Amino acid sequence: MLNTDQLLVRAISERPRKSTEPLVPGTPTGLFSLLSNISPEEQGRLGSGDSLQSQSCQQQRSYSAGQTTKKERKPRRRNKKGRGSAEAEDLFSSPRKPSFPFQWAWESFIIDGQALLQSGSSVAVGHRSLLFPPAAPQCKTRHKSVANLSEDLRACHKSEVQNLGRRYQPGAWANLSLPLGKAESQGLERPTFWSTGKGSGSECEDVSEVEGQNADEAEKSLSTGELPQLPGQGLTLEEELISEVMEEEEHNRRKGSSVNKGRNSGEKGSEEGELQSHNQGSSSNSNSLRKSPKGTSGAKEFKGPWDLERLHRQLQEELESGPQKQTWKALRAAVQASARNRKTPVTGEEESFLTANFPNRTFHKRQEATRNLLQAWEQQQLKEKQQAEMRRAREQQVQQQVARCLAAYTPGGNRGTLGPQRKLEELRRKERQRFAEYQAELQGIQHRVQARPFLFQQAMQTNARLTANRRFSQVLSALGVDEEQLLAEAGNAEGIPRKHRSYRSFGVEMESSPQSPPKTEPTSSQPGRHPSPTLD
C-alpha cells in the first residue's frame, strides 16, 4: 500500500497541468483548479471511501477545527513492555490549528482520492520539491525547541541533530509517512506537511510552546528510569527529534552504569541500529524504517567479560602453556559475575563448559579419586605378576625332584637296555613277513583281474556266439539238413536235448561246449550244395 504523500504526488503528476505555481495548496486558486479538474464520475466517487477513510476524514476535520478528545490523543507508538500509554500521551503535542482556510477540504480530497489512483512508477524527486514548500522555518523553530531542553544535550548531540536536519528535507518527506491503512488502523494522526507563507510565525510560536511543554514532560517521565521507545514512522518532526535526543541521553546514561549493562543489552542494540538507520539521510526509506525495529533480536551480541568464546580460547591457551591458579580464579570470577549480570540464562553447552574446564573443588576431588583408582589397579597388576613368577619357580622345583626319584629307582643299565631291543627286532621281523604276504595276495588279485575280460567284452562275446549259432541253424534249415543228425555225428547229441536246441535256434542259449567243432564244417562237407542267394 502506497504512502499518502506518494499517492498525492501521483494524482497531481498524472493529471495534465500547464504550470506548477497555481497547484500549491496554500493559494485558493490552486485548490479551486484542482477541485475543478475532477470529472463528474470522480466527484460521485469522492465520498464513497471505506469506513476507515471516512473516519480519518472526520478526525482531520475535528483536528482542523480545534476539537480534541481523549480518544484522539492515543499514543502513536507501542511500548515494548505494554505499559507506556499514560507516559506516551504526555510526549505528543496538541493538534495544530488550520494553516489555511480550506484545509479540511484539501485533506478530505487527499483521503478520498485514493480510490481513483492506480499503481504506477514512482515520481521523481524534482516533482516532490515543487509540490512541497520549503520547511526551513519549521526546522529552525524545532532546533530551537530541542536546544531549550538542555545546553548539555545540544553540545553532546550537535552532530546527530545536524544529520537529522539534513534528513528532514522536502525530498525525503515521502519516506517518513506510514501507509494510510496502518496509520488509520492504529489511530494515528495524519501529519500535515503544508505550511503557509504569512501565518508561519504564529504557528512556529505555538509549536515552540507545545514542544517546550513536551520536553518538560519527557524529562519527568524519563527521570523515573523508563526509556520510551523510538517514535513510529508516522510521528511529526518535533516529536521524533525530542524522543531521539532523550533516548540518546538515556543511552549514554545507561552506558555508564555497570549494573544494568546486561539487562539492557538487547535494547541498546536496537537503539544503535535505529540511530544508524536515522543517520543515513537520503538512503533511508520506508522499508528500512520498517525493518529497523525487527533487528532487535540479532543485536544481542555479548561483549566484554561475558564473551564465552574468547574465554574458551584463553583457557585453551593456558591449558597448553600450563595452568595457573591465579588465572583460573580470575576467569572463574569473571564468568560468575557475567552470569549474574547477564539477562539471558546460561545454556546447557555453557554450563557443561564451565563445569568441565574450571578446576573447582569437585574437579579436584574427582581427579584425586581417579588417581587413587589407577594406583590400586597398578598395585594389583604387580601382585599378580609376582604370584605367577613364584608359581613357575615352584613347578620347576617339583619337576626336578620327580626326575631325581625316577633315576634312583631304575634297574641296572645292561638288563634294561637288552630287553627292549629284542622286542623291537621281533616286531620288525613280523612286520616284514606280513608285508610280504600282503604283496603276494595283491599280485594274485591283479592277475585274476587282468585275465578276466571286462563286462562289455563279455557281453560282446556272448552276442557274437548267439549270432553265429542262429545263423548256422538258419542255413541248415534252408538247406534241408537235419541239425540233430549233424550233432550226433559230431558226438554231441547226448548232451543237447530237443528243448535246448529249439531255444538255441532262437538265440537264447548262452553256453556252448568248447570241444564242439566249428559250425562251418557241415557246409564244407557237402560241396555239391550251395546256399540260396536269398539266404545269403
Swiss-Prot record:
Q: Where is the composition biased (Low complexity)?
A: 48-64
- What GO cellular-component annotations does this UniProt entry give? cytoskeleton; photoreceptor connecting cilium
**Skewed-composition ranges (Basic residues):** 71-83
Coiled-coil regions in this chain? Answer: 375-451
Q: Where is this region: Disordered?
A: 1-94, 185-234, 246-305, 491-536
InterPro entries with a match to the protein in the record? FAM161
Can the keyword Membrane be found in this entry's annotation?
Answer: no
One GO-annotated biological process of the protein: cilium organization
Going by the UniProt record, its keywords in alphabetical order are: Coiled coil
Protein name (Swiss-Prot/TrEMBL): Testis-specific protein 10-interacting protein
| Source species of the chain | Rattus norvegicus (Rat)
